[in-house]
C-alpha cells in the first residue's frame, strides 16, 4: 500500500 486512497483500492477496489 502507498497512500490511504490506494490502500482502499488494494483492499476493496473501491474507496
Swiss-Prot record:
GO terms for cellular component: extracellular region. Keywords: Secreted. Its main location: secreted. It is found in: Secreted. This is Secreted protein F1. It comes from Globisporangium hypogynum (Pythium hypogynum). The lineage of its organism: Eukaryota, Sar, Stramenopiles, Oomycota, Pythiales.
Amino acid at each position: 500500500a502507498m497512500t490511504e486512497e490506494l490502500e482502499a483500492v488494494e483492499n476493496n477496489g473501491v474507496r
